[in-house]
């Protein structure tokens, strides 16, 4: 959650409401963020901090020495059910609560290695085996884990190492026969079996060469931009007194071209929307799975084999290297504040991490620099009086506006270069004047509470790039913050307000499927929140000409359509014309970003407000024509005699149907496939009686039927249902949309598994064409499509194949 937990938010808003009017006016009319921060922090009382401390204790982020056994036993249950992914996550939770170099930690690592082995994650399994041995895996259990190590090595084709491992195991067994009841002959037999298995897989290995595994790190911008870091030379930076900074095309741009490839200046993993559990006797430890269990807290890489922080049970990493980097850069300060940071929300957490990454000295320098350039009144609003005439960076001299630049573009250095650095971050707009007084008060008290905790710790853990006078950092704890902490607090308050408009949701595609299904469904989930100074220069459009994707902490902006030279490069902030109507979009953009959208999509829709989108339309029960009207709907066909019907009645029917579809989706998730099919077929019949053929719910029902039929192995019916869903997706999102790409990916899976080779190859090509516009060749789905295509092309010709 971006803002604090509801209890703390409500508490502070009540505190604001109870303040004398004169105090509210003082804060509301404060001219600088420094004044807002100092006025607000003076109102933070010990009882407020005590209440916040109680809330923070709801998050169990410390290590509980009784937890490893609990999680190991819960993991064993999942393992016996053959839910190896679920087992691995629970073993990871056990690892997070274990102390280093203990039997608890070694057993959790060893058990997790078994789950990873069954998932085919052999390299990762070997790492866990080494970790288990490093942390003191019991001698009595060594044969079991050594055999697993040999099996991994054979599966990876490292037969010489496997033979050496077996020899070591046999030698140990001979020396100490009481270690285990595993015979050397059994080990040799297993080794021989695995060698044969590797030989059989040789051809398959050649079919999927390593060259297919393209990553975003391999993707390069066509030509680096000299004035705009992380951007292509096809992109130019401009500024206008009315619209501010924005990006334009300096040359014609083709669909799919990579325009920006930027690493987040700072990012924080989103803990998810799950509230802290109520810690009773029956639920002392949390078994729920969140993003924090599946992704590295530093680089955001997906992993089932997390390495925990030695000091807390919350922070987890994909490797020892990420753990060490995080500790040195920021986590040594954040570690003891884990529960507090989760209570205060992601924005406050990012504000702290940002200042920790930069270092106290550099934060103070840039604030001092701003103070020297402009009046103290504008210390936190450098953009307020810096109105700049139009300037185009990246366009030729003859194409510049000819206007004289009065001041540099905010965020650029003295040479006019805009880079991914703290100067650029600091110059992102906080929109202080647009935020409500109570919101600024809430943010200021959150930062104040955090500063009090940092001050209480005497800043002993705060990393700085240069030595700082110890007397400045180790001031005694007093109700009034010392001047240095005030600078820190003002910077964090500015960043909290900036994040309201400049935070970038870092998303990933998560694949899900019903039990037993080999055809996956996908959904976009918010993984983390970050700040990208260059990406933040993009203005919004409800019908943008770019798409954004993420790999790890890197954002990639690609052209989703042809962009002409001089045309503005636009990004969607969330409200997209294919997902919501113009009124809802306008409201969301106004409340979060403080502007009224006037993009072509909004202007077009504003002129035809009466016509509702086809994916929300009702149809006539008699003739099937679309219904028209506002509160009372009539059949759109003049020849139809069907009587009018109220919109409320149809909306009520729609809500009932949505509930029934929800029941079917749960049956599908639980693996009750036959019941799910019957439920969905009933929903489909009901939908046909009052919903337009391209209604979104009609597509959702068809998609559910396709997944259920695929799980049952009925590929022909699955393809038929999914093609109906495709028509709905195409009408709503367009034939080249990323949504269309995801749906075509599913259809390709169905044709592939149904052995319909021509249909599969044709669909794979269409899916690749759509996805490459939005995701790039590093995307998991694109790489899976390439593997399917490679497999199909290598098949020998067959005269007859199963029909789909």
From Swiss-Prot:
EC number from the UniProt entry: 2.1.1.-
Top-level taxon of origin: Eukaryota
PROSITE patterns: SET (PS50280), ZF_MYND_1 (PS01360), ZF_MYND_2 (PS50865)
Stored Gene3D superfamilies: 6.10.140.2220, SET domain (2.170.270.10), Tetratricopeptide repeat domain (1.25.40.10)
GO function terms (MF aspect): histone deacetylase binding; methyltransferase activity; zinc ion binding
Segments forming domain SET: 233-574
Residues where S-adenosyl-L-methionine binds: 112-114, 427, 539-540, 573, 595
Annotated positions binding Zn(2+) 2: 309, 312, 331, 335
The entry's keywords: Cytoplasm, Metal-binding, Methyltransferase, Nucleus, S-adenosyl-L-methionine, Transferase, Zinc, Zinc-finger
Keyword rRNA-binding among UniProt keywords: no
CDD domains the UniProt entry points to: SET_SMYD4 (cd10536)
GO biological process: heart development; methylation
Gene Ontology cellular-component annotations: cytoplasm; nucleus
InterPro entries, sorted: SET-MYND_domain_protein, SET_dom, SET_dom_sf, SMYD4_SET, TPR-like_helical_dom_sf, Znf_MYND
Binding site for Zn(2+) 1: 296, 299, 318, 322
Mapped zinc finger ranges (MYND-type): 296-335
Cell compartments where the protein resides: Nucleus; Cytoplasm
Catalytic activity: L-lysyl-[protein] + S-adenosyl-L-methionine = N(6)-methyl-L-lysyl-[protein] + S-adenosyl-L-homocysteine + H(+)
Quaternary data: Interacts (via MYND-type zinc finger) with HDAC1.
Similarity section: Belongs to the class V-like SAM-binding methyltransferase superfamily.
Protein function: Protein-lysine N-methyltransferase. Monomethylates PRMT5, modulating its transcriptional activity. May also act as a histone methyltransferase. Plays a critical role in cardiac development. Acts as a key epigenetic regulator of gene expression during cardiac development via its dual activities as a methyltransferase and negative regulator of HDAC1.
Protein name: Protein-lysine N-methyltransferase SMYD4
Organism: Pongo abelii (Sumatran orangutan)
């Amino acid at each position: 959650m971006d803002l604090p937990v509801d209890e703390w938010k409500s508490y502070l808003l009540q505190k604001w409401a109870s303040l004398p009017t004169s105090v509210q006016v003082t804060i509301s009319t404060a001219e600088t963020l420094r004044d807002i921060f100092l006025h607000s922090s003076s109102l933070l009382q010990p009882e407020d901090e005590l209440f916040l401390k109680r809330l923070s204790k709801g998050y169990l982020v410390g290590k509980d020495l009784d937890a490893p056994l609990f999680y190991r036993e819960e993991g064993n249950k999942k393992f016996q059910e053959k839910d190896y992914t679920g087992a691995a996550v629970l073993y990871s939770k056990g690892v997070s609560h274990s102390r280093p170099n203990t039997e608890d930690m070694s057993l959790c690592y060893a058990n997790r290695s078994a789950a990873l082995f069954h998932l085919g994650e052999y390299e990762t399994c070997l790492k866990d085996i080494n970790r288990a041995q490093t942390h003191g895996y019991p001698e009595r259990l060594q044969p079991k884990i050594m055999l697993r190590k040999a099996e991994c090595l054979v599966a990876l084709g490292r037969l010489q190492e496997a033979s050496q491992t077996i020899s070591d195991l046999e030698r140990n067994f001979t020396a100490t026969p009481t270690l285990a009841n595993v015979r050397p002959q059994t080990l040799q037999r297993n080794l021989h079996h695995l060698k044969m298995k590797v030989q059989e897989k040789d051809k398959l290995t050649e079919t999927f060469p390593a060259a297919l595994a393209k990553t975003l790190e391999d993707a390069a911008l066509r030509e680096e931009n000299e004035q705009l870091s992380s951007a292509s030379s096809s992109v130019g930076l401009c500024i206008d007194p009315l619209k501010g900074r924005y990006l334009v095309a300096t040359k014609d741009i083709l669909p799919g071209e990579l325009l920006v490839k930027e690493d987040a200046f700072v990012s924080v993993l989103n803990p998810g929307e799950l509230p802290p559990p109520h810690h009773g006797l029956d639920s002392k430890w949390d078994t729920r799975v969140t993003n924090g269990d599946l992704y590295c807290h530093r680089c955001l890489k997906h992993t089932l084999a997390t390495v925990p922080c030695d000091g807390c049970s919350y922070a987890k990493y994909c490797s020892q290297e990420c753990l060490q980097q995080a500790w040195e850069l920021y986590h040594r300060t954040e570690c003891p504040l884990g529960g507090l940071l989760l209570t205060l929300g992601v924005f406050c957490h990012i504000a702290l991490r940002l200042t920790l990454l930069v270092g106290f000295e550099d934060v103070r320098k840039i604030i001092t620099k701003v103070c020297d350039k402009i009046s103290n009144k504008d210390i936190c609003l450098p953009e307020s009086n810096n109105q700049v005439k139009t300037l185009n960076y990246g366009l030729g001299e003859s194409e510049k506006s000819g206007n004289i630049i009065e001041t540099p573009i905010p965020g650029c250095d003295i040479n006019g270069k805009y880079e991914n650095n703290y100067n650029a971050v600091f110059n992102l707009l906080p929109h202080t004047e647009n935020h409500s007084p109570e919101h600024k008060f809430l943010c200021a008290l959150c930062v104040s509470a955090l500063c009090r905790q940092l001050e209480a710790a005497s800043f002993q853990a705060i990393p700085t790039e240069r030595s700082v006078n110890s007397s400045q950092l180790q001031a005694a704890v007093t109700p009034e913050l010392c001047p240095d902490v005030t600078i820190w607090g003002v910077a964090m308050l500015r960043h909290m307000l900036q994040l309201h408009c400049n935070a970038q949701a870092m998303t990933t595609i998560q694949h899900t499927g019903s039990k037993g299904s080999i055809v996956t469904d996908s959904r976009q989930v918010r993984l983390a929140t970050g700040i990208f100074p260059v990406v933040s220069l993009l203005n919004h459009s409800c019908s943008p000409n770019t798409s954004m994707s993420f790999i790890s902490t890197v954002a990639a902006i690609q052209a989703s359509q042809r962009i002409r030279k001089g045309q503005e490069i636009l990004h969607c902030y969330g409200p997209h014309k294919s997902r919501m109507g113009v009124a809802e979009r306008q409201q969301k953009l106004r409340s979060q970003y403080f502007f009224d959208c006037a993009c072509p999509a909004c202007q077009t829709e504003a002129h035809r407000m009466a016509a509702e989108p086809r994916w929300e339309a009702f149809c006539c029960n008699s003739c099937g024509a679309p219904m028209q009207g506002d509160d009372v709907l009539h059949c759109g066909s003049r020849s139809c005699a069907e009587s009018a019907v109220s919109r409320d009645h149809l909306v009520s029917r729609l809500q009932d149907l949505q509930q029934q579809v929800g029941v079917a989706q749960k049956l599908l998730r639980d693996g009750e496939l036959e019941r799910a099919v019957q439920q969905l077929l009933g929903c489909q019949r009901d939908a046909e009686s009052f919903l337009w053929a391209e209604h979104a719910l009609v597509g959702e029902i068809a998609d559910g039927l396709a997944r259920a039929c695929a799980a049952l192995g009925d590929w022909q019916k699955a393809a038929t249902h999914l093609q109906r869903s495709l028509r709905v997706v195409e009408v709503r999102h367009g034939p080249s949309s990323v949504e269309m790409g995801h749906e075509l990916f599913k259809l390709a899976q169905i044709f592939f598994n149904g052995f319909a080779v021509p249909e599969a190859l044709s669909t794979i090509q269409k899916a690749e064409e759509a996805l490459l516009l939005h995701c790039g060749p590093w995307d998991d789905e694109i790489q899976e499509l390439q593997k399917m295509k490679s497999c199909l092309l290598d098949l020998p010709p067959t005269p007859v194949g199963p029909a789909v």
